[in-house]
C-alpha cells in the first residue's frame, strides 16, 4: 500500500509525481544504494516539475545554482557560448543523468541546458541535498560516484576529440549511445537519435556534411541502417572496432 502522504503529494502535483521507489531508472540516479528510510528523506525534498517542452531551457549560463536536475525521461543538451557567439555543445543527457554538477564550484551555472524533446525532470534543491548528504553517508557516496562518472565522461570526450579521426569519432559516439540506452533498459541495437546531425557534428567537432557522409558510409558497409533519425546497428563488432572497443558490449 502507498503511504497516505505519497498519495496526497501525487494529487497535489497534478499526477506527475513518480517517486524514487517507483522510478525505473533509479539505479542510475541518486537513489541507488539508499535504504527505504533514506529514500523517504530524499523523496521529501525532490520537486517534480511538469514536462519541459522541446527547446525550453532548464537553466542558463550565469544563473545561480539553486537545484540539480535528475532527468526522468527525454534528452537534455548542455552547451556554452564561445567568445565568437557560437554554440558549443558539451553533452547530451539521458534519463537517469543529473544535470548541473558543473555549477557547484562557483554556485553558478557555466553552461546552458535545453530540452531536445519533451522531457520530465526531478528538481533537487542543492542546499537541501548538500545538508542531507552530510547526514547520510550512502547519499554522499552516491553523489560522489555520479560526479566521478561525469568527470570520466569528460576525460573520454577529450580523448575522443584528440586522438580519433572523424570516422572513429562518430562510431564511438553511436557505440557509446547504444551502451547508454542499454543501461536504461532500451534496445541497444535500434534507437532514435533525439539530437540533429548538426548537434552531433557540433559535439564531435565535425560538419553536418561529414556526419551525413559518414552515416552513408556506415550504411554501405552494412555497419548501420539509417532511416531519418532511426538507427539500427547491423554489425556491432565492426562498430565496436571502429570505435576503439575490440570487445563489443552487445
Swiss-Prot record:
Region: Activating region 2A, residue numbers: 47-50
Domain HTH crp-type: 164-237
Cofactor needs: [4Fe-4S] cluster
Cellular localization per UniProt: Cytoplasm
Annotated stretches, region: Activating region 1C: 181-191
Binding site residues for [4Fe-4S] cluster: 20, 23, 29, 122
Record region (Dimerization): 140-159
Residue numbers spanned by region Activating region 3C: 85-87
Domain of life of the organism encoding this protein: Bacteria
GO molecular function, one term: DNA binding
GO cellular component, as recorded: cytosol
Positions of region (Activating region 3D): 112
Region span, Activating region 3B: 81
Region (Activating region 1B): 116-121
Gene3D superfamilies to which the protein is assigned, alphabetical: Jelly Rolls (2.60.120.10), Winged helix-like DNA-binding domain superfamily/Winged helix DNA-binding domain (1.10.10.10)
Keywords: 4Fe-4S, Activator, Cytoplasm, DNA-binding, Iron, Iron-sulfur, Metal-binding, Repressor, Transcription, Transcription regulation
NCBIfam families, A to Z: PRK11161.1
Quaternary structure and partners: Homodimer.
Record function comment: Global transcription factor that controls the expression of over 100 target genes in response to anoxia. It facilitates the adaptation to anaerobic growth conditions by regulating the expression of gene products that are involved in anaerobic energy metabolism. When the terminal electron acceptor, O(2), is no longer available, it represses the synthesis of enzymes involved in aerobic respiration and increases the synthesis of enzymes required for anaerobic respiration.
Protein name: Fumarate and nitrate reduction regulatory protein
Organism: Yersinia pestis
Gene behind this protein: fnr
Amino acid at each position: 500500500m502507498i503511504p497516505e502522504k505519497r498519495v496526497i503529494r501525487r494529487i497535489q502535483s497534478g499526477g506527475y509525481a513518480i517517486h524514487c521507489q517507483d522510478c525505473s531508472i533509479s539505479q542510475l540516479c541518486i537513489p541507488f544504494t539508499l535504504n527505504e528510510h533514506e529514500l523517504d528523506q530524499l523523496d521529501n525534498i525532490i520537486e517534480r516539475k511538469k514536462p519541459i517542452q522541446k527547446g525550453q531551457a532548464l537553466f542558463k549560463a550565469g544563473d545561480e545554482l539553486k537545484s540539480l536536475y535528475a532527468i526522468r525521461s527525454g534528452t537534455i543538451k548542455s552547451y556554452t557560448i564561445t567568445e565568437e557567439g557560437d554554440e558549443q555543445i558539451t553533452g547530451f543527457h539521458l534519463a537517469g543523468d543529473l544535470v548541473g554538477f558543473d555549477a557547484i564550484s562557483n554556485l553558478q551555472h557555466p553552461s546552458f541546458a535545453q530540452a531536445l524533446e519533451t522531457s520530465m525532470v526531478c528538481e533537487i534543491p542543492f542546499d537541501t541535498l548538500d545538508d542531507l548528504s552530510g547526514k547520510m553517508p550512502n547519499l554522499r557516496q552516491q553523489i560522489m560516484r555520479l560526479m566521478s562518472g561525469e568527470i570520466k565522461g569528460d576525460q573520454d570526450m577529450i580523448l575522443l576529440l584528440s586522438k580519433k579521426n572523424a570516422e572513429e569519432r562518430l562510431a564511438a559516439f553511436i557505440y557509446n549511445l547504444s551502451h547508454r540506452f542499454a543501461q536504461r533498459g532500451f534496445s541497444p541495437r535500434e534507437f532514435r537519435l533525439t539530437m540533429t546531425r548538426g548537434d552531433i557534428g557540433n559535439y564531435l567537432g565535425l560538419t553536418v556534411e561529414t556526419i551525413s557522409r559518414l552515416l552513408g558510409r556506415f550504411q554501405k558497409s552494412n555497419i548501420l541502417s539509417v532511416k531519418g533519425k532511426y538507427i539500427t546497428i547491423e554489425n556491432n563488432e565492426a562498430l565496436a572496432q571502429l570505435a576503439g572497443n575490440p570487445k563489443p558490449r552487445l
